[in-house]
Amino acid sequence: MWALLPQRWQVLIIGASAVILVTAIDALALHFTGRDAGPLKYLSLAVTIFTAGIVFLAQLFWFKAAELIPWLQTKTFPDLNGTWTGVLRSTYKAPGSDTPWPPIDTTVTIKQTLLTISITLQSGESKSYSNREHFEPDYRNKHFRVWYSYSNEPKAEFRHRSAPHDGVAYLEMDWEVDRNRLTGRYYNDRGSSGDLDLKRKVNPKRR
């Protein structure tokens, strides 16, 4: 959950990691040339190997552990991985029309790791991809929101009335109400907006 850390902490961690990594590489170089690197550099090497192992294991097993112990998700951020289906209701009106667009069947695919998240939305006419994401947890009320900016690419056959565009959106989970439902809203540079209501295709093993 790297994105949940304050920016100052991120900078400090990156800086410290860079120093430790450089020292560890120097220790390896000295070791393989038969010279003594000294205790500090060997310590940096050990820390680097240990940290890399922890990160690797966390990437593999964090969400499995969080599934068994849901409390972990309420203290970090819920596991949003999966395929979500539902309806998008838009204020968009086709050129020359005053009639709002009818509800659109929508599929959202979320891929989340400890360090990253990506969101893809697919409808019958277009596909959008997230390009920047931001986690916004409300731990007190157990509401979890992810904001993201996106680029939308309509299929060629629909571009006469729906041009490529960019926008920003959020998806929100109310942990106490339904862990397999997301609601949200989007705004785009065409001046339209809309609401999303999605349900996760549930794995029988998921709690």
Where are these regions (language model features)?
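Amphipathic/hydrophobic helical signal segments and adjacent flexible N-terminal regions
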Residues: 1-79, 89-93, 202-207
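Central antiparallel beta-sheet cores of small beta-barrel/beta-sandwich binding domains
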Residues: 3-5, 70-207
